[in-house]
Each structure stands twice: as C-alpha cells, then as structure tokens.
Amino acid sequence: MTATRLDGNAVAADVRSAVAAAVSALPGQPCLAVVLVGEDPASEVYVRNKVKMTEAAGMVSIHHRLPADTGQAEVERLIESLNADPEVDGILLQLPLPKGLDADAAIEKINPDKDVDGLTEVSAGRLSLGKPGLRPCTPVGSVILAKRALGPDLSGKNVVVIGRSILVGKPAALLFLAENCTVTIAHSKTADLANVCRSADILVPAVGRPEMVRGDWVKPGAAVIDVGINRIPAPEKGEGKTRLVGDAHYESCAEVAGFITPVPGGVGPMTIACLLRNTVLAACARRGWTVPEGL
C-alpha cells in the first residue's frame, strides 16, 4: 500500500478560497491586527505572509511593529487599545517575543472574542466545555485534513494524539472528541507507545521528535496527520546543510498508511488559512453577522 499524500498547500488554498467567498458575502470587511515585537527574521516572514493572505482574502490588515526593547507594559497597552477598537475583529501577537517579555501575560490581555489564535485561558476553557469560541489554528487544520482524507463524518474513529502540549496536543484531542471520535492522548510516559499508535484510524504525532513514528507503528490504511516540524542535518546537501522532517518517518509510514501529510507542505500551510477563517468567525460573532455557508 502506498499512502495518498495529503497536500496541505492545496487544502489550505481551498480554505482561503472559502474565506474570500465568505468575506465577499459579508456586509463589511473583517479586520485582523498583527503585533510584531522585535526583528526575528522568521517572524518577519510569517507576518508578511499573514498580512498578504489577509488582504488577498478581502480583509483589512493592520500591522503594528514594536522595537525589540519595548517593555511589557507598552506591549500590553497596545493590545488593550486594539481590544477597545471597534474596527478590529482579531488580534494576533506574533511569537516568540524577545527575551524579557512575558508572552503568556501578554496573550492573556487579548479579548477572548478577538483571540484568533485561540491561546487565551478563556478560549481554552470554551473549547474544553464545548462552548462557542475561537479554536487554535493548527489543531483545527489537523481536523480539516483528517476530514479531507476520511470524509466529513469522523464519528467512531479511533484517534491517537502523541503529545499533550497546550498549543497542539490537548486542543487537537478536544477537537477530535467534538467530532465524536474516541481519543487517546499519548505522551512520554505512555506504556508501549507503538502498540497504542497501531490502534489509531487517525494518528496525530505532535511532539517535536524527528521521525519518531515508524511504519510499523501505523495501522494499515490509517490517516497520519503529522504536526511535527523538525530541522535535522542533511550532509547529502553539503556541509552544514539541514532539511525539515516531521515526527513521522515519511517513507516507512507511507508504505502502510492510507493517507499521510508531508513535512513541509502538510499541516503548516493550514495554520494561516485557519487564522483567516477565525478572523471571519470573530467578526461575525462580534458584529452580529450571519456566518456565510462554506466556512
């Protein structure tokens, strides 16, 4: 068996198209405010991509850039001013922050109704309780990819999420539970991890350990949604060169699985697409607009 490759770029493009169609049907333009502190090169690229895709979807993008020596109070004052701005629907604080700043404290200043990353404690509580709210983007993207593989109804599927992080593992487990899946959260203390993984119809490795999941861990025909992104040495490319791999060993897993996401080009592209989707959902909830069909 050779797994079908789940192209995250293609699925993300579909989500962005649905977002653009939804925006065109709204009575106004949703607005996303992005806050970047410092000059981290990777963050600069991420923010440029987010701004570009936000505007391409027909939404308003506001970009606030603060110097690296900005104090905690100034960051939090900016967030509070964006909370109070009736034109702003979503607030994104680009991470990581420069050393000396408390990211958790800054995130907690974001109004949960504008928390398009789904990272505040209130957003986490709403997810846990099954209340309406904004969900973390990477876990949402993982569920969308699983549905693209196995169909829109995931009821009864066995899901194993490897990893219990607050950013991916726990919210992914809760989102699959909301789809009526039977969910196991595995972690570093799980006994016989390989055997646990072999029970999964949907396997979601999210631990940041390069190529940990091997083909003999995978149930034949399963969907492997690889959230991991790791940089490892690639001497075949030349001295000092590296390459990106996931938490699953792609070649061996692809021989057994029915579907598998590549790294890069799998879950990663879904994150920005789901951020745009969250911005539309936040705007509709805040402004009393009906959510357009197709989101």
UniProtKB/Swiss-Prot annotation:
Subunit and partners: Homodimer.
Highest taxon, organism lineage: Bacteria
Example GO molecular function: methylenetetrahydrofolate dehydrogenase (NADP+) activity
Keywords recorded for this protein, A-Z: Amino-acid biosynthesis, Histidine biosynthesis, Hydrolase, Methionine biosynthesis, Multifunctional enzyme, NADP, One-carbon metabolism, Oxidoreductase, Purine biosynthesis
Enzyme Commission no: 1.5.1.5, 3.5.4.9
Record-stated family: Belongs to the tetrahydrofolate dehydrogenase/cyclohydrolase family.
Alphabetical list of HAMAP family matching this protein: THF_DHG_CYH
Name of encoding gene: folD
Keyword NADP found: yes
Single GO BP term: methionine biosynthetic process
Name of the molecule in the record: Bifunctional protein FolD
Chain sites annotated for binding NADP(+): G163, R164, S165, S188, I229
